[in-house]
Amino acid sequence: VAELKTKETEASVEEFLRGVADESVRADCRKIAGMMSKATNEEPKMWGESIVGFGKRHLKYASGRELDWMKIGFSPRKQNITLYLSTGEAWDDELLSKLGKHKTGMGCLYIKRLSDVDEKVLQKLIEKSAAEAEGS
């Protein structure tokens, strides 16, 4: 069984965020960190080299594979800010339709910048995801 590369580390979240070159992305990431911290009641931790995660949960797959993973998290990437959210069975299409400019993938929400989305709707998506992860 392959070892999961992305694990919680002791690296400094603040140092990582200070290293985000684009000032507006850095500010957005700090705000997203606050939103996620509020939703999970957890302090941010680095997962691997580039993901800021909140909380921890144990996942078991039908294949028998088990791993520890963050409840929710985010990562500033070259093209966008990736939010790692727990979506349960599916995305909440009603909330997503009110969010603004975004894309979705498997458990990921991609936004360019916070100014492209409705922050209140994003907070609801984050809170819903945190609650979903809590129950898994």
Regions found by a protein language model. Give the residues of each.
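Charge-dense, helix-prone N-terminal extensions
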Residues: 1-136
